[in-house]
Amino acid sequence: MENQKQYPMTQEGYEQLEKELEELKTVKRPEVVEKIKVARSFGDLSENSEYDAAKDEQGFIEQDIQRIEHMLRYALIIEDTGDNNVVQIGKTVTFIELPGDEEESYQIVGSAEADAFNGKISNESPMAKALIGKSLKDEVRVPLPNGGEINVKIVNIK
């Protein structure tokens, strides 16, 4: 049996996925079953766009349920070590881009809970890969997608 990929995540991320799964199973799935039932009542299924749309939606919901169940089954909860001197998954890192003094902060999380719009970056991102394992006041080179790089200085870890 091959090794199954684990999904590192914070406890908060795990709980968020559990809520999402519950919503899919108890709200979204029954809603789409009802849509299918109503669409069937329209008669001929061969030319019934409402039925086709509802079946497609059902497929997406079932895929999401399977994906989330898989991630939860193979979740690796990253415990907070309490060490705010080293960057690790679950920590929020504040840094300044050098030269300069404008601060940016991101929480490093597992890919399953990454949400850049809310300041959560995946541990698999170039930024996080460059920061993980580094310490307070370290200067770090971060590769950019265009082949360049930026230099940042870590000013806070929490």
Swiss-Prot record:
Coiled coil: 2-70
Superkingdom classification of source: Bacteria
Keywords, in A-Z order: Coiled coil, DNA-binding, Transcription, Transcription regulation
Family classification: Belongs to the GreA/GreB family.
Pfam families given in the database record: GreA_GreB, GreA_GreB_N
GO annotation, biological process: DNA-templated transcription elongation; regulation of DNA-templated transcription elongation
Job of this protein: Necessary for efficient RNA polymerase transcription elongation past template-encoded arresting sites. The arresting sites in DNA have the property of trapping a certain fraction of elongating RNA polymerases that pass through, resulting in locked ternary complexes. Cleavage of the nascent transcript by cleavage factors such as GreA or GreB allows the resumption of elongation from the new 3'terminus. GreA releases sequences of 2 to 3 nucleotides.
Protein name (record): Transcription elongation factor GreA
GO molecular function: DNA binding; RNA polymerase binding
InterPro entries per the UniProt record, alphabetical: GreA/GreB_C_sf, TF_GreA/GreB_CS, Tscrpt_elong_fac_GreA, Tscrpt_elong_fac_GreA/B, Tscrpt_elong_fac_GreA/B_C, Tscrpt_elong_fac_GreA/B_fam, Tscrpt_elong_fac_GreA/B_N, Tscrpt_elong_fac_GreA/B_N_sf
